[in-house]
Amino acid sequence: LRAFFFSPHTWCIMAPSNDAAKDGQMNATTTCGIPRLKNIEQVSEGWINKYILTYELPDGTDYVYESTSRKKLEAYRAGLMANARGEAPRVDAVCIVGETREGTLLMIREFRYPLNSWCVAFPAGLKEPNESIRECVDRELREETGYRLRSDVDEPVRLLPQAGFSSTGLTDEAIQIVFAQVEKAGDAQPEENELIAPFQLPLSDVRRFLDENTTLIGTRAQLILEVFAARAER
């Protein structure tokens, strides 16, 4: 029996000692170390790039792992090294939790090609290289929904303290969740291949929506909506 536990920079294996195993006790010996990234091989290139990562585990054995990223090889390598140093991740995209003055959440149904289906989500999009978070939020709102940041609020955006990773078993994509006060600005202007239907969800209806929705839904949307539902039920 072996157990694994982690700190930000340490990887540990905990195994029962021989004497403990004889006695049926859980006294254990612990070996700690850090997996070492030995090699990154790019095996396909495109909008999504695929990589083979070779690690040396603390016990000296090699471990090969497949991953994907929108970043090209050198940018991907630099990002992995920055992660290992404990640096804050560079924001790749934003997820916008927009609330209107009418007490509704701004949501979308978007056709997601990897799913071959419509999916419920919050408005979101990739950040341009020289774009601020606020600029990205306002642009994505206008493009996907026809909404904008409210002009009558001094600070219409609130960022979570750090960007979070969208799917840590697959990719390095880091997403900044932004809570925003939004208002209608005009017509949406999505790209030709973007099929997006914005809708407003009253805060009082969030629990019923979660219980009754049958359209596919993103995990972020599920979790955030659950928080709003629980808050409304207090």
Where are these regions (language model features)?
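Conserved Nudix-box catalytic region and its N-terminal flanking loop in Nudix hydrolases
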Residues: 83-139
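Acidic, metal-coordinating catalytic segment for phosphate/diphosphate chemistry
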Residues: 47-95, 101
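Short Gly/Pro-enriched turn/cap motifs at secondary-structure boundaries
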Residues: 41-44, 85-88, 168-169
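Aromatic (phenylalanine/tyrosine) cluster motif
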Residues: 4-6
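Alpha-helical and coiled-coil interaction segments, frequently adjacent to or embedded
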Residues: 19, 24-51, 56-61, 72, ...
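Nudix hydrolase/Nudix homology domain
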Residues: 15, 19-21, 27-34, 39, ...
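Active-site segment of metal-dependent pyrophosphate-handling enzymes
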Residues: 90-92, 99-102, 112-114, 142, ...
